[in-house]
Amino acid sequence: ILLYKGVGMMWILGLLVFLPLLTAGLLFFIQGDRLRDAVVKVSAAAIAMLSLFVAFTYFGNKVVFRLGDSFLAQGAILVDILVALAVFYYTCVRFHRYWIALLEAIQLGAVLWFEYVSHGTLDYYADIVVDNFTLIMILIAGVIGSLIAVFSLGYMEAFQKEHRDVRDRRNFFFFVLFLFLSAMFGLVVSNNLLYMYTFWEITSVCSFLLIGYTESRVAVNNSFKALWMNLLGGAAFAAAIIVMGLTYHSTALSHLVGLALAGMPVTVILALLLLCGFTKSAMMPFSGWLLGAMVAPTPTSALLHSSTMVKAGVFLIIKLCPALGNNHAGTMAMFVGGITFFFASCAAISQSDGKKVLAYSTISNLGLIVCCA
């Protein structure tokens, strides 16, 4: 195990998170097709190459960073608030879905309260962990996500020509797409659940924005379905953080696994995190949001299915895998995954619509992964 406190590898990981974030900021203000194409292609190539470099350089070496109670923790709180403000804007100001805003307000209030009461009392075992599994996820997000971004250039241009009734918001589309990739990188390297929660919420909001891109009634309704289901998972995530932090004075995912292996009573925490993973990975009965996402442009479907959204859910569950033996949480994961695999497989073979076949087959494969975990 290589233990770092902020050198070398930390800068590379920071670049992996901030490069797509900076690209997103640029693309938000770019209206011209040529400049947008150039920025997307260069950034996608850089992200893919950086992902490959990280994977091949550090494969086989587990890297751990202890950041402690640093400015990054304060930054995570600020991001949580910004994400909540985005949710409040869409739910209260634009579309008047107040009960969804209430769900966001409850979990934000709970996390902020926990940050206040636990300040200075948490043991920071390892905030960032990069192992072989993390590197595989970095490759999936970095390489496949970059290919989707490049593919989106031509597709979205043709999409806007064929759908004159849809407002051309390609600058916003690519802004959200690269923000999505940035959040995914941050999520998979986070071992501190507080950091992971922040990136988790960003992916939820990004999926909501991408699904509702066309602004049609069906798209808006389906985007809100995805939002409230994932916010429900976010509330479970926040509850798990609070229970673990107040009980064991730690929010490290690896510490949670260690506690479970030592026979400590962590079933409630595991169950809450599994519920969070179920919503994100579209396990039944939460599979409706992924089916609804099919109304979005094809690059959105590709992004949600292959490199980001649903992979985040199974990533968390597989990370918890060593802790799921001989407890009710593991049994719950097995049954939910098995039931999802069976019924989604049956639904997939009965469909004639290509996108629905893709959605159900994705859900069934995810169910099999969860069941085996």
Q: Where do the model's predicted regions map?
A:
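Generic enzyme active-site microenvironment
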Residues: 129, 199, 303
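Hydrophobic transmembrane alpha-helices and their helix-loop junctions in integral membrane proteins
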Residues: 147-196, 206-373
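Transmembrane helix-loop-helix hairpins at membrane boundaries of multipass inner-membrane proteins
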Residues: 3-15, 25-175, 250-261, 288, ...
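Hydrophobic membrane-targeting signal helices
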Residues: 18, 22, 26, 55, ...
